[in-house]
Each structure stands twice: as structure tokens, then as C-alpha cells.
Amino acid sequence: MVRLQEQYQAEVKQALRDRFGYDNVMEIPRLSKVTLNMGLGEAVRDKKVLESAQAEMAEIAGQKPILTYARKSVAGFKIRDGWPIGCKVTLRRERMYEFLDRFINVAAPRIRDFRGFNPRSFDGRGNYNLGVREQLIFPEIDYEKVDAVRGMDITITTTAKTDEEGQALLEGFNFPFRK
């Protein structure tokens, strides 16, 4: 079992049960998935951008990303329906816990001027969204091979019913929230 998963089973689960007074063990919030998304508007002009972004995301996530396509044509963005405009990967189970462990303990401290993540970025249903400005914070990415600095969106989906429960769950994993 992964370190973060063991921590959840041993400490976080009981702490959440004590704090919120759940009657049923299935009520206790848990992580369900982590989604990484990279929107690449410049991929319209250069297909190599998409390939390198896919390779970098595969390195970061440990899983091959899928391409995302434009749902409709937008003249202002110079895109047509069905053109590839990004890539995403959904992590579950062990890979999700491994990624989150690396993100919290290695990648997040490497963010420039990092003082913690905003605790207001919950969506009202216990899920947390954050953006990363550069992929270089991940140790898997070789600085020499990077052709452009790209950011990504990270969504942490939980089974929590409220933002307070979701925040308590992530704090149990030592997620660095701003005070």
C-alpha cells in the first residue's frame, strides 16, 4: 500500500470520524480521483507542442494522457470542432495516492513564492481545484528537455459532501493550505 493510503487508513479516517461524528464508515470522506488537465491553445498551430506536452504529462502522472478535442468551432480562437486542443489524465487508486504524495511533499515546495494553496478553491461539494503555472516543479521533468513552460489544472475529487469535510480530509494528508 502507498504511504498516503496507509496514513488515510491509520490516522485520517479516525480523525474525520471523531470530528464530524459519522455513524456509517462509508460516510467518511475519501479521495476518489485526481485529474490533471493541460489546455494547449498553441497546439492548433504546432502539433509538436501536443506531443511534447503529452510526453511530459505521462512522466508526471505515470500514465498515458488522452487528447482532448474542441467541442465546437470558435473563430476568435481560430479552432475548429474536433481539433486536438489539450490533454488530460485521470488518476485513481494507488497512482492517485502516489501522485498526491509526490505533489504535496516534493512538487508544491518547489513552487516559486509558495505560501500555501488557497483554501477557498473548493467547489461547494468538497472537491478542490488548483492551477500550476509551470511543469518544472515536478522532479520527473528534465529541465534540459523542456521546450516551453506550460501550466496545468489539478482537480482533487473527494466523496466529501461539504467544503469543510473536503478541507479536513486534505489537511489530514498535510496538504499545504494558506493560513
Curated annotation (Swiss-Prot):
Stored InterPro entries: Ribosomal_uL5, Ribosomal_uL5_bac-type, Ribosomal_uL5_C, Ribosomal_uL5_CS, Ribosomal_uL5_dom_sf, Ribosomal_uL5_N
GO molecular function: rRNA binding; structural constituent of ribosome; tRNA binding
Protein keywords: Ribonucleoprotein, Ribosomal protein, RNA-binding, rRNA-binding, tRNA-binding
One Pfam family in the UniProt entry: Ribosomal_L5
Origin: domain of life: Bacteria
Cellular compartments per GO CC: ribonucleoprotein complex; ribosome
GO biological process: translation
Gene3D superfamilies per record: 3.30.1440.10
HAMAP family xref list: Ribosomal_uL5_B (MF_01333_B)
The protein's role, per its UniProt record: This is one of the proteins that bind and probably mediate the attachment of the 5S RNA into the large ribosomal subunit, where it forms part of the central protuberance. In the 70S ribosome it contacts protein S13 of the 30S subunit (bridge B1b), connecting the 2 subunits; this bridge is implicated in subunit movement. Contacts the P site tRNA; the 5S rRNA and some of its associated proteins might help stabilize positioning of ribosome-bound tRNAs.
The family this protein is said to belong to: Belongs to the universal ribosomal protein uL5 family.
Full protein name: Large ribosomal subunit protein uL5
Source species of the chain: Alkalilimnicola ehrlichii (strain ATCC BAA-1101 / DSM 17681 / MLHE-1)
The gene coding this protein: rplE
